[in-house]
């Protein structure tokens, strides 16, 4: 069974999440100014992302996930590391799911056991 990009994105992507990211970035601009004037010289976005993820783990407030996404995006745009690069990796180099298995892998395992 193949799925179209439209079907995949309808089920497994959130435009509402991206809109919340945009709203938060806009509000942050009015509070703090241009991001490229702050990152990475005055603050490191990846450190902010780690702090917000820790807050999410404590509070389960999904607003922190919006913050994490924005800080990760800012780190992508304005990296703290001078040697930062984008290098796509194949599945064999992926670190995978943290202590878990995907539904697809589970079902493939069941099929192989039959």
Question: What is each PLM-predicted segment?
Answer:
Residues 1-114:
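Flexible "arm" and connector segments at domain edges
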């Amino acid at each position: 069974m193949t799925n179209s990009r439209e079907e995949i994105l309808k089920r497994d992507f959130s435009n509402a999440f991206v809109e919340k990211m945009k709203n938060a970035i806009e509000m942050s601009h009015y509070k703090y100014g241009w991001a490229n004037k702050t990152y990475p010289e005055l603050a490191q976005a990846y450190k902010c992302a780690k702090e917000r993820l820790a807050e999410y783990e404590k509070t389960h407030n999904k607003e922190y996930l919006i913050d994490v996404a924005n800080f990760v995006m800012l780190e992508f745009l304005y990296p703290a590391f001078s040697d930062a690069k984008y290098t796509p990796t194949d599945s064999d180099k992926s670190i995978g799911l943290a202590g878990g298995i995907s539904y697809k892998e589970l079902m493939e395992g069941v099929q192989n056991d039959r």
